[in-house]
Swiss-Prot record:
Cysteine disulfide links: none
Main location: endoplasmic reticulum
InterPro entries assigned to the protein according to its UniProt record, in alphabetical order: PIG-U
Protein's gene: GAB1
Name of the protein this chain belongs to: GPI transamidase component GAB1
Pathway assigned in UniProt: Glycolipid biosynthesis; glycosylphosphatidylinositol-anchor biosynthesis
């Protein structure tokens, strides 16, 4: 085990445990924040599912729990609040470790191996997401594990299994199977990876059924159907909620289908266009899902930002990094203020909060556009950076 990666992981764990100890009430405050908690990732909802499962009560008949059965079953094994905090810290530490190990696969970048892992460890967004005990951390862990398995260990099968787990936990990450297949060298590996992913997902669903026993397949509707159909129109940092508050009921099913197609439709073009740089296509796909998913949180953005150091050789091509950074800072500072004005004080309205969520989306979108431009420029320059050359976008 590499000492650098281990130090980063231990530092990440220590920071999270220290914050938990110093600010014991912070978890509940963050869990009530729409920036870090959504109806499908909330720890309150997870606790409700754990309670119902332990008491042999039907978990998914009350419209409150939207977490997958295996996750609920896993966390129900631990009774201590401190132990659960430790589990979340360990998961975050493992993500930091994996990011550090993945960096070693890109020695030609001349990137400090500890930088992505350290950025993840000290990033306030990932730190607070972990403290809030949002279940998004498990999805992020599955995604980082998939990259770690294929890039650091060369294990295609395990990487495919981890992508299936991420899809099992949050639906949309299963789309990352497409750029994952683009990272494989032969069609034989791609077909095998796709088969393993599908079989793994089926096994996870069957195991979920066995956990619930007589409750049959009701979890499919509450866990996955509620996300795809955006069942709970709840304010968040995403683009969906305001549209479906204002929209006539007649048009809602059609536009929900359109929004879902919109998430999926750009994954394959990213993969095909950047087939020579499949890892970067994978990162862009992560960013696209973060931008377009129905229930995003700042934990999603923090995870995506941890991969930005891999674009270091392209930073000279970025056209408006300062604008993107200021947009993002503007959004994360004003989002809780505008939500408080709207919901708590009643001196604002939903337009306040949705306006700032649009700024947040614009920040993520501008980062994605800038990264795409940078990748096209390095390709135009035949892999040799030429920052002085001025090229006009047509």
């Amino acid at each position: 085990m590499d000492s650098t990666a281990l130090k980063v992981a231990l530092g990440c764990i220590a920071i999270r445990l220290a914050v938990n100890s110093l600010f014991p009430s912070l978890q509940q405050q963050l869990d009530q924040s729409v920036e870090f908690s959504t109806p499908v990732t909330s720890f309150r909802s997870l606790q409700e599912g754990i309670y119902l499962l332990r008491n042999n009560i039907q978990v998914y008949n009350h419209g409150v729990v939207h977490h997958p059965p295996i996750l609920i079953f896993f966390l129900s094994l631990f009774n201590s609040d401190r132990l659960i905090s430790l589990i979340y810290a360990l998961i975050d530490g493992l993500i930091a470790y994996q990011l550090t190990e993945v960096t070693k696969a890109f020695k030609n970048l001349k990137l400090k191996v500890w930088l992505p892992g350290l950025l993840y460890a000290v990033n306030p967004l990932t730190l607070l997401s972990c403290i809030s005990r949002s279940s998004i951390i498990f999805t992020n862990f599955a995604i980082s594990s998939s990259l770690y398995c294929i890039l650091a260990e060369g294990n295609v099968l395990l990487s495919s299994v981890m992508i299936s787990i991420s899809g099992y936990l949050s639906v949309y990450p299963i789309l990352l199977l497409i750029p994952l297949l683009g990272m494989l060298k032969s069609w034989r590996q791609r077909i095998l990876s796709a088969i393993v992913s599908i079989l793994s997902l089926l096994i996870l669903l069957l195991f979920s059924y066995s956990i619930l026993g007589s409750q049959s397949w009701s979890f499919l509707t509450q866990v996955y159907g509620s996300i795809i159909t955006f069942e709970k129109v709840f304010p968040n940092l995403g683009l969906w909620w305001y549209f479906f508050i204002e929209m006539f009921d007649t048009f809602i099913p059609f536009f929900k289908a359109v929004f879902n197609i919109f998430i999926a439709v750009f994954i394959t073009p990213f993969t095909l266009r950047y087939h020579k740089q499949p890892f970067y296509a994978f990162i862009l796909c992560i960013g696209w899902i973060v931008l377009t998913k129905p229930y995003p949180s700042l934990g999603d953005a923090g995870f995506f930002f941890s991969f930005l150091p891999f674009f270091t050789p392209l930073f000279g091509y970025l056209r408006y990094p300062i604008i993107s950074a200021l947009l993002f800072l503007h959004a994360i500072v004003l989002a809780p203020i505008f939500y408080h004005l709207w919901v708590v004080l009643g001196s604002g309205n939903s337009n306040f909060f949705y306006a700032i969520s649009l700024v947040y989306a614009l920040a993520i979108a501008s980062i994605l556009v800038d990264l795409n431009w940078a990748m096209l420029r390095i390709e135009y320059d035949n892999g040799i950076p030429n920052f002085k050359l001025k090229v006009t976008q047509i």
